[in-house]
Amino acid sequence: MSQKNYRPWTPEQDYLIPPRPRDWLPEGHLAYFILDVVAQLDLRRIEAVIQAKDPRGTVPYHPRMMVALLLYAYATGTYSSRRIARATFDDVAVRFIAGDTHPHFDTIAAFRQVHLDALGALFVQAVQMCQAAGLVKLGHLSLDGTKILANASKHAAMSYERMKADEVRIQNEIQALLERAKQADDVEDAQLGPGQDVVDVPAELQRRESRLAKIQEAKRALEGDAHRHRAAELREMANTHDETAADERLPARQRKTARTLARTQREKADELDPPDGPPTAGGSADAGLPAHQTPALADGSPTAKSQRNFTDPDSRIMVAHGEYVQAYNAQVLVDGDSQVIVEAVVSNQAPDVEYLVPVVQRAMERGLKATTMTADTGYMSTKNLDWCQNNGIDAYISMARQRHSEVPAAVVTRRDPLAVAESSSEPERPPPTSRERMVAKLATPEGRKIYARRKTIAEPVFGQIKEARRFRRFSLRGLWKVASEWSLVCAVHNLLKLFSSKQKNIALSVAG
């Protein structure tokens, strides 16, 4: 029986004619799309920073190549600068994008760090590209949030109560070690004479001093945050008393008391947070977004349970899937027809309720206003309902956690004629509240149908980002940096939606 022949295999065979780089990738590959997109992006902010440097020295890599490299890496779930650098050797598509150059991982990390703000700003351009392609319909937007792990361990966080206890304990340990060192010195002086072979400060003493310095620094920062939070509360209370003092309908004694209280509260606030004090680091990446406020007592000191993380002080311990994690709260506003993210923010405030107004408002400022919007119960508040109504948004916000197929419980509104027996003597009932109107709207078949769509709009986006592309933890630390990184991640998500749409259109044209 004749032996089976094999196809030729000569992996070390040189090419007589060098192959074209595009011959290595199939037609319609994502790498081609990324290069086409980068050619259209406005990168003047990045180029301006590079051109401002001294022309002497190492020649930099082309900024469009570096941006394309990062976009493709993020699109394929590669976020580590070391892995991206290795991929320029191991991955054919990455090698093609890099033009067979191999930036060091330090170069990739530095480029991302220096141009992080400009890279995050690419999100707006990605949304505009999706708009131009007809992917953003703005008929139905869905708002949702998810917890993204911080680049820090929750075990690196310490409460204010623990800080104070550890500060005293370590100070006592340092004192005991110094006493032991002095005793050792006295023994050596008696044996060898003064000044001979004095013992060095033990390494354990240096470790404790270093640990003590870190705890004291974190303690001061936590106290400063609490002071500013309490000062803001006092100033808000003082403003309320000013309104009372200005109301001429009130008795003179009450107005005088209000003026005294306002003055006292402002003096206390200025003592805790001087108006001309130095600027503070941290806080929200955007002044319009909610940010975590350190709980403070009446005297401005932190509460016992107030915490601060030593590795990433801006991150907070939050609850995700029933467990406590060190994380940030990432928010997206998603188009219902294409799952394109039209607005993306991140902050360190765990509850979702305060995000609705600033996130939707930011989208509206860029001309992205929905006629219908859905959100889960985490965003339910009278303030949010009234704001949506005043801005012409038909909102569907769940009143309580429920399955998407579950029918909301019937609620009798104040004006329901079936609520009470008809009576000519019955006084006119007040109009239903915004919450009652929302319950009634969600109880209708149309309301249930619209709200059920939320499950297929925002939630799959988080699945694609966190599971398909494995972005579950930020690579960077600090609120401003993770905000830009989240914008970059969402920009890549939108570009992938645009890529998928183009591929479908090509397939349809071929089939037609």
Each model region followed by its residue ranges:
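Anion-binding and metal-coordination hotspots
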Residues: 2, 8, 70, 78-90, ...
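Hydrophobic alpha-helical membrane-insertion signals
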Residues: 2-32
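Short, solvent-exposed coil/turn linker segments
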Residues: 20, 42-45, 159
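Basic, short loop/linker segments at the boundary and entry of helix-turn-helix/winged-helix-like folds
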Residues: 27-71, 76
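Helical catalytic core of nucleic-acid polymerases
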Residues: 42-44, 53-58, 63, 87-100, ...
